[in-house]
Amino acid sequence: MKTDNKKELFETMPVTKAILTLAVPTIISQLINVIYNIADTFYVGRTGNPYMIAGVSLALPVFLMTLPIGNLCGIGGGSLISRMMGAGKGKEAKSVSAASFYGAVLLSLIYSLLIFLFMNPILRVLGASADTMEFSAQYTTYVVIWGTPFVVVSAVESHLLRNTGYSALASAGLSGGGVLNMLLDPLFMFVLFPKGQEVKAAAIATLISNIIAFLFLTMVLIRVSNRSPLSIAPADLKNVKKKQISQICSVGIPSAVLPGLFDVANIVLNSSMAVHGDLQLAAMGIVTKLERIPNAVGIGLSQGMLPLVAYNFSSGNRERMNSAIRKGRRMGIVTAVCCIILFEVFAKQLVGIFLDTKAAGEAALTLTFAASFLRMRCAASPFQFLNYHSSYCLQAMGDGKGTLIHAFCRILLIYIPLMLILDRIFGQNGLAVSLPAGEFLSAFLAIWLLRRWLKKPHELK
């Protein structure tokens, strides 16, 4: 797509069409990303070994901690680039692009080193037992220690491409990696590797897929750099200004904090559920995979909407910006309600993707727990979307303070305390219902923060 078409997308295209143009590829890539992460659990579940499932689930929070790094550099840099485009400063944005790219490289390498040094203690804190430690360590070694730089930099590249209007190309890279992983998983797990090494095989397949996605997105970013505000050239890195770094961090840090806080919440959830038993832990691991589907749609829609809101915020077109916010909110709520209906009606069948519905013994009990947890937790979907929607709108307009306040209150003051209280009162079911209860309360805060920001006309200059 040429530059003049990008201007049409941001300035004159009907708002609904513009949102869909930016969001649909993003949603697709988010869903494929979820599916290929689910694929590991699906194929591991085919082994009939609940300890392997629990081991992979325990490694998930360690992997998800890579998301804050991607958000720091990707959303922080991408949001700033969109605002600079709206202000007519596209050429100056190349230094922001380069700073985001190399910042991601540096931070991801540091994270990989830290996990390499402290993997076993971290996994024990997460709830790994003697039965699950081996599998958790195998998955963490390949997917996190070796894979983090490729995952993080790919995420940043996709954010940068999306925020300059190249949403389809950004999604193609991430989606391609996901599809490849789904193809490699069964090949590695059941053909190339011996029985008992299924978790290791799945992890290696994921690593290879992430490397290929990284190579594709890097090639795309280099190719579009001559006709866009994007660049990964070291020469442009030299031109970055301290003010630009500050602006990246003002939005990027709150964006990084939220998934990091969710990781803390997942640690609390896993540790609390592990007290109730390995089967309950395995069941919750399946549910947290499935509930990422409505999350992926909500996040994809919000991320697709972000550059449109950011561009028109900076250009001063408040009417178009507000229209994008309203229409994006309606789309997300309708989708979330549809997900609730799907999960409530087909909970057992969806859980059965990971475990044989005709199984007996431990597998059957795990399935029963998972179906029950899923029906309880899916009620959070519309409230989760409202939280994501408001947060991404604030990020688009550069309100890092509001985003940070919301993130801390949502997780540390509302969700985690509710989790601990409800666990003490209702046990494992209390842990399940803590998510919809927490998201419901957080949504009120999110909407209030967004409306408060929009009532400041001086901020829209």
Could you describe each region identified by the protein language model?
Residues 11-42, 46-47, 61-76, 80, ...:
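N-terminal transmembrane alpha-helices
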Residues 21-40, 177, 209-213, 217, ...:
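Transmembrane helical elements of multi-pass membrane transporters/channels
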Residues 31, 35-53, 123-130, 187-197, ...:
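Helix-terminus/linker motif at the lipid-water interface of multi-pass membrane proteins
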Residues 53-113, 151-170, 283-347, 384-406:
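Small-residue-rich hydrophobic transmembrane alpha-helices
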Residues 74, 143-162, 170-178, 202-218, ...:
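Short runs within selected transmembrane alpha-helices of multi-pass transporters and secretion channels
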